[in-house]
Amino acid sequence: MKEAVYSFSNSAGDKFYLRLAADSDLFLSKELASFLKDKGFELWGIYLERLGNVQKVTPMKLLNKVSQLIATFFIGHPNAILYYQCDDISDVPMSFKKKETGMLVQEYRNRLFTKKKKKIVRKLNVSVIDTPIYIDACGNDVYIHLMSREIHADIAEIISKDIHQGFDK
């Protein structure tokens, strides 16, 4: 599996890894993974991992750095479609109002990714679309985003349908 890994630390001593991995065959149907490969497309997962937990909140400066790295990677890979799945592995600091409304951790991360994606798009010199995918997985909501060039919107839609079909089984 092809991957690109970036590591960096914040001033509090937390170490972060940004990993982009061409891992479409993990969750796409074999037919679609083969189709994408034949057409020269690659689906890259975006993974941000924190080692250590000195600072509970990921600083905006660090998120901006992550955005810049993703933008640079995207520019260098013209047939890449990126995806990010918003998980609920660890809690995130939310305002009291958001907690009161029952906002899920995944939904909070979903909104954050949408904002960060807008920053990434401003750095790029190409038209980019965000294809959000929401799946109601029996109480464990799943939020996924596909980031693709506008000229690949049809491919992003095919991927979205394939993901939905996989979860519907």
Cite the ranges covered by each PLM segment.
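Non-catalytic substrate-recognition and accessory regions of acyl/acetyltransferase enzymes
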Residues: 1-169
